[in-house]
Amino acid sequence: MSDNDELQQIAHLRREYTKGGLRRRDLPADPLTLFERWLSQACEAKLADPTAMVVATVDEHGQPYQRIVLLKHYDEKGMVFYTNLGSRKAHQIENNPRVSLLFPWHTLERQVMVIGKAERLSTLEVMKYFHSRPRDSQIGAWVSKQSSRISARGILESKFLELKQKFQQGEVPLPSFWGGFRVSLEQIEFWQGGEHRLHDRFLYQRENDAWKIDRLAP
């Protein structure tokens, strides 16, 4: 098969979206109410990693980057994730805190996009979550200098065993280079797939202490 033939096959991959629609009359005033409902349904549908979200950032040259992390908490203040503070995404957030999040619930023909500003969590918040993690995950946080170049996986595995021995007694301390971010809720868009590509899109945009809701063309 030539590259062109393969490209033509990819171009014809499509399906109809038939899971259901989203109507303005059914929308709650608060987007978190709808987000919680959709997240709960994603969990009930046993989707793999329903809390997985794409985090998009940009560097100082305007180059965008994306990666998948796990949502660990959400409320009216924002959505929370944790990471190595020496990572590429953490450095980019320090330089430009404006980010977007995307929850891709393909099986349910849904996606949710969040736009806001990321801010560092307090040490107390980070410590509380860090010590709730499995012990091996706590040790793993110490091992990797995230986004740095390494010559082989064995380096990580050897370091893990070394630190597991070092921390075998007592509590694993919180690394100074490990933390979290809370992304504020400025805009939240809900997308529901529709037949004939007539998808339903609704944008919640914060205006003072209320939410403005607009339907967007697909």
Swiss-Prot record:
Catalysed conversion reaction: pyridoxamine 5'-phosphate + O2 + H2O = pyridoxal 5'-phosphate + H2O2 + NH4(+); pyridoxine 5'-phosphate + O2 = pyridoxal 5'-phosphate + H2O2
SUPFAM superfamilies per UniProt: FMN-binding split barrel
Binding positions (FMN): 67-72, 82-83, 88-89, 111, 146-147, 191, 201
GO cellular component, one term: cytosol
Disulfide feature: none
Annotated Pfam families: PNP_phzG_C, PNPOx_N
Remaining remarks: Can bind a second molecule of pyridoxamine 5'-phosphate at a non-catalytic site in a cleft at the protein surface.
The protein, known as: Pyridoxine/pyridoxamine 5'-phosphate oxidase
Species whose genome carries this gene: Escherichia coli (strain K12)
Gene name in the database record: pdxH
